Amino acid sequence: MNTFFHIAGTASLSLAVAPATLAAPVWEIDFNKGLETARDGNRTVMVEFTGSDWCPPCKYLRSTILDSPEFANYAERNKLVLVELDFPRTPGKISKELMKEREDIMRRYGVTGFPTVMLMDGTGAPYARIVGPTKTAPEYLEKLTKAQDLKNSLNGEIAVARKLSGSERAAALAKALEKVPAELQGYHKELIAEIMASDPEDRFGFGKKEKEARMMAQQSEMLEQFYLSQRGKIRGEELRKSREEAEKILSSPDLLPPIRLKLNKFISDSYALERNYPKSLEYLKSARDSDPGSKESSRLQPWIENMEKIIAREK
């Protein structure tokens, strides 16, 4: 798992310095309980994904910013529901069951770096993601305030849109959703359902996107199960059979590009283990070409260039 440092309200919301006597904010460690608390009071949930005992940027964020009186005052004034999801490495610090539960949440929200903070409503729909700390607490609070301003603007536009009907309602709701960063829009399932209900002809494409999202979830789960079933098979006949299984999955015409990329990369890695670098390079290129234009595809180019150098040296 990658880390940040690579293992890697309204505008008037106060940034005022807190009194020294202000009590430290309480952090919930149960994600679902935090959402429930937020729903009951229509509050914002601030979720921190952290590695408290091994991640230097996480320690800096906590000691310099989240434990500061400025943040305590901000959290109190804005009634934030604070949730800490810690991923410690100290043996026995948390149970395996709790670690798995948190890893599932991390995957659900696409968290790939520590520390990551996400701001969301009580339904679990996020509208902001902050990766890494800032140098000072006031700088971080500015980021939080901008996120809260976005939320308030979003809610205002939704309220206006709900007074409309038919295609006008769908158009206004879709425009409101555009305020949310593109990578977070898909989590706003209730809002998307509202848009689709007012857009039976799917002019805004959310019906198609929802279908693709369901397929991605199903295929991602299938891929996860495949990885688990192949764990430890790193040599000889077992490795060959693993490739055959991956090839069978790749033969499906409905396989989505990101999944196709990962399977090609899996096969490439298996050939690399056997030092069959030409075949490894072949599948690396297939992986890159499976999802052109994606970040994952662009990240493979250095691998391809390195493999080409290895092959050239062995000639």
Indicate residue ranges for each PLM-predicted region.
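Thiol-based oxidoreductase modules, predominantly thioredoxin-like and allied folds used
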Residues: 24-29, 50-51, 64-100, 111-114
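Loop/turn elements at helix/coil->beta-strand transitions in domains of secreted/extracellular proteins
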Residues: 41-45, 78-83, 112-115, 122-125
